[in-house]
Amino acid sequence: MERHVPPLWTYGDDNNRKLNEQVYITEFIKANQVRCINNQLYSPDGAFEDGRAKQLIIDDIMPYVKSNHGDKAEKLLRSIKTLCYAEPPTPQLDRLHVANGTLTKDENGQFTVFSEDKEFCLNRIPVNYNPDAPNPERFMKYLDDVFQKDDQVTLQQFCGYCLLPTTVLQKALIIIGDGGEGKSVLGAILNGVLGDSNCYNESLSVLQSPFGVANVENKLLFIDDDLSENALKNARTFKNLVTNKTTIQAQKKFVQDNQIKPYVRFICFGNYTLQALYDLSEGFQRRQLIMQAKPKEPDRIDNPFIDREILENEAEGVLLWLLEGLNTLILNHFKIAVSDRTRAQSDSFKQENDSVLMFLNECDGIKIGEGLRAHSSTLYVAYEHFCRDNMLIPLKERSFLSMLKTKGRNLGIKGHTEPFELHTSYGTKRARGFFGISVNDNYININF
């Protein structure tokens, strides 16, 4: 009869063996090949969640620890993290880690070279690379049902871009529609192909919390499947993450803050475009690529399990679709293809969300032209009236003046730092203001 060999990390008599914590910690790290980066365990398969680690520890030590297994597992996990601490690695842009190995670039810079060798990584895609995977017919039909053909090219390239840990495109994809088209199914499919540990599913509003940034550390994709109509009170974090090339301070609950270099990309689905309450800058607008889903065909019958069926049967084919998009993007030097229709829609939506630009383009109470002048306070009163009439949220005074200088530049409007006199129906007043624009007294009188 074969004799049972006790674990190396135990000691004592056969009937009363005990746990050697120091040896167990070392053996756990060795067996699971884990490293601790910013208090998170990672293995060659990517993120190694604390819950999974504690369950493995409890299963191991249960025969050798009489009580308080949860507390003991918590203590051991803390020691494991301390012992296998490592500095964050530089994101790898020359390889992709898939379930069955590693993809690297060929002589043309395309991800076509496959090896079954696995390396330590922060982001492993939980789908096998199979160059002979059949065409994902369900997935392609879903795309045809929901998106225009030329928009599918943009989608393929942007979604493929999410495989790489980089923010080089400096764009967030905002997909909008009237509701019921099935646009957010794409988010569920991407979450399944990229992997739960590589995606963060939440509302963008979470980024306004002090601990919001820490949630996207080492994530490939942020998915908001129900974009709120409420504007962001502070858009700075969103802008920084979309274009990030440096380290950012991340606050975490109950642990020390640390510096992270996030590379998360954003895909948001909703009935509204993304708006910022106090940021109408070109930078905020430029970071958004706005795409509109096709209206739902009246006779289309939806399959409520389509995302599950695609992931169960076509995940390898969808991965090839993503790789094709990424490789095309690389060939185009990371210049994403955008249809004229979508580009025009993006520009239109951006203007609709820009109250200052709308004021300059649409307000009947102002004139724009050479030789005209207006005081800043008068312009702001006219702007407030325009926003009230059009149910827009006006900016604060200083923000309005800053945006007026920026938005008015192309229209010949210039701020003047020296006070000047103006004669109006209210009398003569001396104050600072702008050249190239004037306000009709009657417009203000009517609105008072």
Stretches found by the model and what they are:
Residues 1-37, 63-181, 185-448:
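Feature primarily recognizes SF3-like P-loop helicase cores of small DNA viruses
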